[in-house]
A protein has these predicted regions:
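His/Asp/Glu-rich mid-to-C-terminal helical/loop segments that flank catalytic regions of hydrolases
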Residues: 314-377
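Soluble metallo-hydrolase cores and metallopeptidase-like ectodomains found primarily
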Residues: 16-40, 96-169, 181-184, 189, ...
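Metal-dependent peptidase/peptidase-like ectodomains
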Residues: 1-6, 204-311, 315
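Soluble non-cytosolic domains of exported or imported proteins
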Residues: 62-67, 74, 102, 106-110, ...
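Structural recognition of the beta-strand scaffold that forms the well-ordered cores
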Residues: 54-59, 78-83, 103-106, 141-144, ...
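Extracellular/luminal Protease-associated
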Residues: 13-109, 167, 171, 184, ...
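Short helix-loop-beta-strand segments that form the rim/entrance of peptidase-like active sites
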Residues: 97-99, 185-212, 232-235, 370
Length: 377
């Protein structure tokens, strides 16, 4: 709550501690200096800043939420609010719940500006963050083609879970349904030809709680199994009603790990771009923001690619001219909300993304990275 009585929203980060009952009342404080320092990623960010007992206000980007929390807590802050630097809300989580020290959440860019003004004026604000953390068990569902060359394994995946707040039709039921269709198509004779590769279809659990299912899958692969896994294709939110046609950006650096996609990822991106073009549509490289199941494969050095329809980010005017829809509005206005239901998703978007995915999956089911259009035989 601000001094004028307004109550801008805060999205609590996954695994964040809660504020005390009744909330936390304190002055917000921002790290001074350049853009890098305002991200609050390095211990020196708060040098000369009276952060003890205050609410740290930092910009998104530059490091993980864990790092932002650790640095702010080390400076004596009582909580951290991370302001988006673009349109939309901030939906985040902590990668290491055991290391969580102080409450942390995300706010929109506009709310960040309001809080910065409160800090400049020396006024206090009240922040209330409530979270529940429990230990639970979930499962991945893995389907493996009975035939195909195991020395050249192609993995495709989509997460099955949703956030507690919504039924998760676009995030991520539509993608899981398309993945299932791919598996059913592969079941009809795949593996009977000598050029066929082994196909694995991963329906991941606990993506919304830190990409846990896909990370577990990669972590439990033997060294030999990792070597055999030649590429990964990811499907995420492909039915967004105000959709974009995005491919995973093979030239981007992961904002948390600093890793770049493995060699071969650019070819996968190009194949997906060509598959959209074959439908008369232009795709664009999407945000490689570390928020989907490709991350575990990227971290293991496995070439990655994928399709994505957009979530809470706002569609630009240029994108609206390219794909239609409403500029300045989220790709999915029901992201992580109760309205994420079957009536909301775009069948057109699901078809475009699904066809592009199936085209590329079919190609790599019989080809290796770097091969042309002629199957091995």
């Amino acid at each position: 709550m601000l001094q004028d009585g307004s109550t801008p929203g805060v999205v609590v980060s996954g695994y964040s501690p809660s504020t005390p009952q009744g909330g936390l009342t304190a002055r917000p404080v921002t790290p001074g200096g350049d853009a890098e320092r305002r991200q609050g990623c390095r211990p020196g960010a708060y040098d000369g800043v009276p952060a003890t007992g205050r609410i740290a206000l930092v910009d998104a980007g530059g490091c993980s939420m864990d790092d932002k929390q650790r640095v702010a807590a080390g400076a004596g802050a009582a909580a951290v609010l991370v302001a988006n630097t673009g349109p939309g809300e901030m939906h985040t989580w902590l990668a290491d719940p055991a290391a969580a020290r102080i409450p942390i959440g995300g706010v929109t860019q506009e709310t960040g500006r309001l809080l910065a003004a409160e800090a400049q004026a020396g006024r206090t604000v009240q922040v209330t963050l409530r979270s529940l953390t429990e230990r639970r068990t979930t499962e991945n569902l893995i389907a493996v083609s009975p035939g195909g060359n195991p020395e050249h394994t192609v993995v495709s995946g989509a997460h099955l879970d949703s956030v507690p707040e919504g039924p998760g039709i676009n995030d991520n039921g539509v993608a899981a349904a398309v993945l299932l269709e791919g598996a059913l198509a592969a079941a009809k004779g795949h593996g009977t030809r000598p050029e066929d590769n082994r196909l694995v279809f991963g329906f991941w659990g606990a993506e919304e709680f830190g990409l846990l299912g896909s990370q577990h899958y990669v972590d439990t692969l033997s060294a030999e199994e990792r070597k055999r896994t030649k590429l990964y294709l990811n499907l995420e939110m492909i039915g967004s009603p105000n959709y974009g046609l995005f491919t995973l950006d093979s030239g981007a650096t992961d904002p948390v790990t600093g890793q770049r996609p493995a060699p071969g990822s650019a070819e996968i991106e190009r194949k997906l771009t060509e598959a959209f073009a074959a439908q008369g549509r232009k795709s664009l490289p999407g945000p490689a923001d570390g928020r989907s199941d490709y991350v575990a494969f990227l971290g293991a050095g496995i070439p990655t690619g994928g399709v994505y329809g957009g979530s809470f980010e706002a569609k630009t005017a240029e994108q609206a001219a390219l794909w239609g829809g409403a500029a300045g509005r989220p790709y999915d206005p029901c992201y992580h909300l109760t309205c994420d239901r079957t009536a909301q998703y775009s069948r057109e978007a699901a078809t475009l993304h699904g066809q592009a995915f199936q085209t590329v999956l079919t190609h790599y089911s019989r080809h290796r990275l770097g091969e042309g259009s002629t199957p091995r035989g």
